[in-house]
Each structure stands twice: as C-alpha cells, then as structure tokens.
C-alpha cells in the first residue's frame, strides 16, 4: 500500500513541491505568489483524490483502506509542499526541525496506535497521516503560508512551474523503482508476511539515512 501511495503523490500533485522549492530560490521572487500556486495544485489534488475513492473501493484489496490511503496521500503531499516551501525560502533551520519532528511523530504515533491500540495497518497509515498533518501545520505557521492567501494567481508563472515539475515525474518513478519496487517483488514471490518482515528490517538504515539526508538537503543550496 505504501509502495503504491508513494508514487501516487507526485502524480496527483504534478510533483509541484519541486517547483515550489526551485522557484522560491530565485532572487527577488514573490514568495507568496509561488506558495499560492503550490496550494492551488494541492487543492486540485485533494479533489481528484476524493473522486478516485469510489474507484479504489472497487478494488478488493483496497476497499477497506481507501479513506486511510487517501488521507495518507493528502497529508504526505501537504507536508512535502510546505516543507519545500520552507527550503525554497531558505528557512533551513525550520526545514530541518520540520523533518526531525516528522520522524519523531511517526515513531510516537506508531507506538501508540500499533502497540497500545492494536490498530494494525490502519494505525500505521494514521500514524503517518497525523504526523504529516502536524508537520504541515508547523511549516504553515513558521513559513507564514497564510500570507499567500491574499496574493493573486499568476497564470503564466503557474504554467512555468507546472512545465518544470511535470518533467520531473519520471524521475520520481525511477526513484520509486529503485527504492520501493522490491517490496512488490517480495510480496508476489513469498507473500505479505515476508514483505512485512523485510519492510521492518529496512526501517533502521532508513531512519539513519533520513537523519543524514535532512541536513545534507537543508544545506545543499
């Protein structure tokens, strides 16, 4: 489920988070204008995702989890866009704090939902969704995203940003193939249980990589 959701986010959002970061880095740019465009694309993704829920209900393996998957995808898209907004505005300390906060919240919510409430895959999805929404709120406040509500939509700039971000979607597919396609192969060959063990064993190196990646990305521009 997470493997599929990972690739759904850049497709639904047209990978606009990369454009938000890139165009905010330009000198003398109107940051509120760039952020507003990112929010507009996000709202469109939310609507399209809601329309797709009835379709996913027709897939037996997803029917019971469609709403949870939807909220996970939307929360992930929101947090990515707002965090990229912070990075584009060169609020690097706030960006790093947001990523660290996200990691800690995911761990905390997983402990509560999985160990105490025994909610299984629903708890796992909720843990990520809640963590992403909280981090989105944090980035919304420290990045002063609310200022963008009063700016007008620059259609030419929007087209420019979409042209930039859309061509990066294949790049997301390539990263997905490298990092996540193995989960589908493990599931198809030896079953879901084995894939669960494989996924858990991968968490520790991923966590370490996440912490180092946070600071590498924050200070790379």
Roles of regions detected by a PLM:
Residues 1, 26-42, 46-74, 116-125:
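Membrane-interface helix-capping segments at transmembrane helix termini in multi-pass transporters
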Residues 1, 58-67, 90-97, 104-137, ...:
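Membrane-interface helix-loop junctions in multi-pass transport and translocation proteins
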Residues 1-9, 121, 157-164, 168, ...:
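Interfacial/gating helices of multi-pass transporter permease domains
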Residues 6-28, 206-221:
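Helix-loop junctions and terminal segments of transmembrane helices
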Residues 7-11, 43, 47, 51, ...:
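Alpha-helical transmembrane segments of multi-pass membrane proteins
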Residues 20, 81-88, 92, 114-115, ...:
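C-terminal transmembrane helix end/exit motif
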Residues 27, 88-89, 116-118, 180, ...:
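Helix-loop interface residues and adjacent transmembrane-helix termini in multi-pass membrane transporters
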Residues 67, 93, 97, 121-127, ...:
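Interhelical loop/hinge segments that connect adjacent transmembrane helices in multipass membrane
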